[in-house]
Regions:
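Transmembrane-helix signature of 12-pass secondary carriers
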Residues: 1-192
Length: 192
């Protein structure tokens, strides 16, 4: 049977399943952060505020998140071993991710925005490696794959939410057009 708990397993499985599903929320953080930039870079106010960046600079702004994610994913195992899985996730969101979001939201120049993208990527990389690790180590084996797969689903939900928020703010004639989508990431971090 599908998702049938083994009869010889002792204890309640539902607390671990709920915690694992909640941890999947980190995927929204990842997907939303990845998805916001595609809409933001086309917003008229953002283009004017950031001195009409050329294609090379746009490529840097978009891809620097992946550089941070790469570095974060490499460091995630070490951090998780030092701080523990749960605290590793919490610290990854509180420190590098929130710093990156703050820098992006406050930025009025390309270098600060690029630095913010890197630090947000660092936090996303740390989280994206630690959450599946945490889920895999805490969930019962009979449900583990489905719950870890929910993390991937949450990435897609995050991309969808980013598209909605970008669409809703794109025609604002002020910095709120790009700052609102960026600042909403604080809410995702707070929830996680």
């Amino acid at each position: 049977m599908f998702f049938e708990r083994p009869s010889d397993e002792k204890g309640a499985a539902w607390p671990a399943i709920l915690v694992g599903l909640f941890a999947s929320f980190g995927g929204i953080l990842y997907g939303y952060d990845t998805g916001t930039i595609s809409g933001i870079q086309t917003m008229p106010y953002w283009i004017e505020e950031f001195d009409n960046p050329n294609a090379g600079r746009i490529a840097l702004i978009v891809s620097i998140l992946s550089v941070g994610t790469f570095v974060g994913a490499l460091a995630a195992g070490i951090m998780a071993d030092i701080t523990g899985r749960r605290w590793g996730i919490i610290l990854s969101v509180m420190l590098p991710f929130n710093l990156g979001v703050a820098l992006q939201t406050a930025a009025t120049s390309q270098p600060l925005f690029i630095a913010g993208r890197f630090f947000a990527g660092l936090g996303v990389g740390l989280v994206s490696a630690q959450i599946p690790m945490y889920q895999s180590e805490t969930l019962p084996k009979w449900i583990r794959g489905a719950v870890v797969g929910c993390y991937q689903l949450c990435i897609t939900i995050g991309l969808f939410l980013a598209a909605i928020v970008n669409w809703a703010t794109q025609h604002r004639p002020d910095s709120g057009s790009y700052r609102i989508p960026l600042a909403i990431q604080f809410a995702w971090a707070l929830i996680l």
